Amino acid sequence: MNHLGDIMKNSLKVEPIENGTVIDHIKQGKALNVYNALDIKKDKTITIAMNVPSGKNHKKDILKIEGIELSKYDVDKISLISPNATINIIKNKIVINKFKVEIPNTIEGILKCTNPNCITNIENVAGKFDVEGREPLKIRCFYCEKFLNSIEVYK
């Protein structure tokens, strides 16, 4: 291999961020869902990496957002899309906090009930769900008690 090939082989494919958030271990193919769920301002520098090798025969997605620290609400949204994601808070190119997302016991204001007769679809009431199971995901509407599974939640 020539010198340029050696440099390319040993270099990073994506620049590290100075300050912001890296969402790692996003389920393969879900990075755009996470990006869309976060409603990030258009002036932010964002890197989306999809189908990145991760361990033996596994792939993951990664989302890097410069200048953003996520709220608990945002982290809860991510947990519903990719329950094994990891959040890294970066300051001056150093990881100052790293944690795995967790599906909360109660989900409020993130989802709407799929029951057309539920009060959340008739009046201006935010959706509220109790988590009944995590693997696989199963949630119950607080108001009408309709169950939703992971397929309905991840749409």
From Swiss-Prot:
Zn(2+) binds at C113, C118, C141, C144. The keyword Metal-binding applies. InterPro entries: Asp_carbamoyltransf_reg_N (IPR020545), Asp_carbamoylTrfase_reg (IPR002801), Asp_carbamoyltrfase_reg_C (IPR020542), Asp_carbatrfase_reg_C_sf (IPR036792), Asp_carbatrfase_reg_N_sf (IPR036793). Its cofactor is Zn(2+). The keyword Plastid does not apply. One of its GO terms (biological process) is pyrimidine nucleotide biosynthetic process. GO terms for cellular component: aspartate carbamoyltransferase complex. GO terms for molecular function: metal ion binding. Keywords: Metal-binding, Pyrimidine biosynthesis, Zinc. It holds the Pfam family PyrI_C. It comes from the Archaea. Involved in allosteric regulation of aspartate carbamoyltransferase. Contains catalytic and regulatory chains. HAMAP family: Asp_carb_tr_reg. This is Aspartate carbamoyltransferase regulatory chain. It comes from Methanococcus aeolicus (strain ATCC BAA-1280 / DSM 17508 / OCM 812 / Nankai-3). The gene is pyrI.
